[in-house]
Amino acid sequence: MAERSDPLTRGLVALIRGYQVAISPLLPPACRYYPTCSQYTLEAVRRYGAIRGSWLGIRRLCRCHPWHPGGYDPVPDLPGSAPEENGRPSPDGQHSGSGG
C-alpha cells in the first residue's frame, strides 16, 4: 500500500520521528515487541493514514506492558488490502474477492 500524504498523516509522522530521534534515545529500552511500538505506529500511520494508523498504534501500546510476553508483531494487512483481490487469482491459483 502506498504511503499516505495528507497533512494530518504527515504531521503525525513528523511527531513520531521527532520522538524517535529526540526522546527515545534518552530512555531505557522498554518495548517488549519487534518492531518497537513507535516504529509500529509510524508504519501503521504511513500505510493506513492518521485515523486508522493511530488506532492500530494505540491498540499496540495497550498491549505493551510487563505482563505480556511481547515478541514479533508486525502491522497487519487489513482485509481488502491484498493484491489478489477483485477475483484475480493468487499465486497459489485460488480466486479471491466477490468475482469468480
Swiss-Prot record:
InterPro entries: Membr_insert_effic_factor_YidD (IPR002696). It is a peripheral membrane protein. Residues 73-100 are annotated as: Disordered. GO terms for cellular component: plasma membrane. Keywords: Cell inner membrane, Cell membrane, Membrane. It comes from the Bacteria. The keyword Phosphoprotein does not apply. It is found in: Cell inner membrane. Belongs to the UPF0161 family. Could be involved in insertion of integral membrane proteins into the membrane. This is Putative membrane protein insertion efficiency factor. It comes from Synechococcus sp. (strain JA-3-3Ab).
